[in-house]
Curated annotation (Swiss-Prot):
Protein name: Probable GTP-binding protein EngB
Record Gene3D superfamilies: P-loop containing nucleotide triphosphate hydrolases (3.40.50.300)
Cited InterPro entries: G_ENGB_dom, GTP-bd, GTP-bd_ribosome_bio_YsxC, P-loop_NTPase
Keywords, sorted A to Z: Cell cycle, Cell division, GTP-binding, Magnesium, Metal-binding, Nucleotide-binding, Septation
Species for this entry: Rickettsia typhi (strain ATCC VR-144 / Wilmington)
Gene responsible for this protein: engB
SUPFAM superfamilies membership: P-loop containing nucleoside triphosphate hydrolases
Length: 214
C-alpha cells in the first residue's frame, strides 16, 4: 500500500499520539556484536544509505531535534544507537550503508554489525527501509531487502525527503515493481522531516508493534 501522507482513519490514532508525546532517551550504543543489549522490549529499526535522513526522521517522530545526531556528512552514525520511549518501545538507528567516506575496514565492520543485528535480534518487530526520494531504489537497498526477507523480517519502505519531489509516479511505479520482484507486500510511506508529511502515518505504524510484543 502506497501512502502519500493521507491521514489515517482508525482507532489507533490516539495510541501513537500518546506514545510519542513522551520523551525518548538514548540508552545504549553498540560498536560490536557483543555490545548489543537485550531490553526485552519491541524494537523498531531504521536502516538506509548514508545521508538518507535517518537521524532527522528519528528526531521528528520523537519530537526531539537533538536526540539523534544530524549531519550533512555521510557516515555520521558509526554505531547502533538505541533509544527508549517510556519502556514501551526501542527505536534503533543503524549505521548507514553505501557511500560513507570511511576506510574499507570500517565499512566491513559496519556490515558485520548490521547483518548480525538484523539476523539475530529477538525483539525486532519492524524494519523501516529508508530510501531517498530523489535517488530512488538502488542496488544496496535491494540487497538489504533480500536480507530481511531471508530472515523473515517484516519491513516497510519509507521514502525520505518527500518535500524535494513533486512527481511521484515514477517512484510509485519503481516501488511496486521492486516489491513485485521480491514477492512481498508492505506499506510505502512518503515522509519529510521538514514538512512533517507522513509522520502521523509512520508513528501509527510503529505504535501498532507494541500490541504484538512477544
Amino acid at each position: 500500500m502506497i501512502n502519500n501522507g493521507k491521514a489515517l482513519n482508525n482507532k489507533k490514532s490516539s495510541d501513537y499520539s500518546k506514545l510519542f508525546r513522551h520523551q525518548a532517551k538514548f540508552v545504549a550504543g553498540a560498536n560490536h556484536i557483543n555490545q548489543i543489549p537485550d531490553f526485552s522490549l519491541p524494537e523498531i529499526v531504521f536502516v538506509g544509505k548514508s545521508n538518507v535522513g535517518k537521524s532527522s526522521i528519528i528526531n521528528t517522530i520523537c519530537n526531539n531535534k537533538s536526540l539523534a545526531k544530524v549531519s550533512n556528512i555521510p557516515g555520521r552514525t558509526r554505531q547502533i544507537n538505541f533509544f527508549n520511549i517510556i519502556d514501551k518501545l526501542i527505536i534503533v538507528d543503524l549505521p548507514g550503508y553505501g557511500f560513507a567516506n570511511v576506510p574499507i575496514s570500517v565499512k566491513e565492520q559496519w556490515e558485520v554489525l548490521i547483518t548480525y543485528y538484523l539476523r539475530n535480534s529477538h525483539n525486532l518487530m519492524l524494519v523501516n527501509l529508508l530510501i531517498d526520494s530523489r535517488r530512488g531504489i538502488k542496488e544496496n537497498d535491494k540487497k538489504v531487502a533480500e536480507l530481511l526477507l531471508a530472515n523473515k523480517r517484516e519491513f516497510q519502505i519509507i521514502f525520505t525527503k518527500s518535500d524535494k519531489v513533486t512527481d511521484r509516479k515514477n517512484l510509485n511505479y519503481e516501488a511496486q515493481n521492486f516489491l513485485a520482484t521480491l514477492h512481498y507486500s508492505c506499506n510505502v510511506i512518503y515522509v519529510s522531516s521538514r514538512s512533517k508529511e507522513g509522520t502521523k502515518e509512520l508513528k501509527a505504524s510503529l505504535a501498532k508493534c507494541i500490541k504484538y510484543q512477544r
